[in-house]
Design a protein with these regions (language model features):
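C-terminal structural segment of proteins
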Residues: 1-267
Length: 267
């Protein structure tokens, strides 16, 4: 059970940051996982008054505020068009609409949970995070960092000419995933493939363009590279060996799908 001594609705990012420097204080986010912890919170810091609940699309990027809910993300027409439905596919299995109306992008990215569909999804994009004091860094670098007490302000997704594809394996429709896979094929033929729910946090693999190589051959090559390198673990949802096998299977499917799309668009 979580006990909160004081509640403060921050009036500025500076105030939120100052409050968050005390170890006993916590940023609330969407209060999905935090409320399940057995902790005593000195001051609960609410960011809902700072205008961080919007998605702004420009010609070259998306700016996604930390307080944007997963449901907002799921329903955003611009993101749906840009990712060819990958965002919706990544989010639709997360428990239910009620939870997705509460859970925030910032909470999902800051937590860097191993099972996070959100982290896996954005890892395959040209995505950065903006921290109040730490500035803008790549999501990949942020995912590898230890937890700190900075304030995550927004995600920045740079638009690029690419095709995206998302898959997950689950034991039931809305369960935590056994393994997740997000893939991007860039216009020059290079690939970015993120594998999550290992059950460790998502990792990114990048493959150079190999134009002229048959799709099946390229898919097998990428799948073997991922299988031979990935570190997986076991839990109640699956063994390390099973996850390693799935990583290869999902990588192969992703490459075959994206190569087929590219070939179709070229005809």
């Amino acid at each position: 059970m979580m006990t909160i001594r004081e509640y403060k609705r921050a009036e500025s990012l500076e105030e939120a940051w100052q409050l968050n420097q005390k170890k006993a204080n916590r940023v609330l986010g969407g209060m999905i996982w935090l409320k399940m912890e057995n902790i005593n919170v000195g001051t609960a810091i609410d960011l809902s008054g700072l205008g961080l609940d919007t998605i702004e699309e420009t010609e070259g990027s998306f700016s996604i505020g930390a307080m944007v809910t997963l449901r907002q993300l799921e329903e955003h027409a611009g993101l749906a068009a840009y990712t060819h439905g990958a965002v919706k596919e990544a989010l639709r299995h997360i428990v239910g609409v009620q939870l997705r109306n509460l859970a925030t992008v910032g909470g999902s990215i800051y937590s860097r949970f191993g099972f996070s569909d959100v982290l896996t999804l954005f890892m395959a994009m040209d995505c950065s995070v903006e921290l109040y004091k730490g500035g803008i860094i790549s999501l990949q670098e942020y995912a590898e960092r230890p937890y700190d007490r900075d304030i995550l302000v927004r995600l920045i997704v740079k638009k690029e000419e690419a095709e995206f594809f998302y898959q997950s394996v689950r034991n039931s429709q809305t369960d935590i995933p056994v393994l997740t896979c997000a893939a991007a094929r860039l216009a020059d033929g290079c690939y970015r493939i993120a594998i999550g729910a290992r059950p460790l946090k998502a990792v990114l693999y990048e493959f150079p363009a190999e134009n002229g190589v048959p799709a099946q051959e390229l898919a097998l090559k990428c799948a073997d590279a991922v299988k031979n390198d990935i570190i997986t673990g076991s839990n109640m949802r699956g063994s390390a060996e099973y996850r390693c096998h799935l990583a290869g299977v999902l990588t192969k499917r992703a490459v075959v799908e994206l190569e087929a799309r590219t070939a179709q668009e070229g005809n």
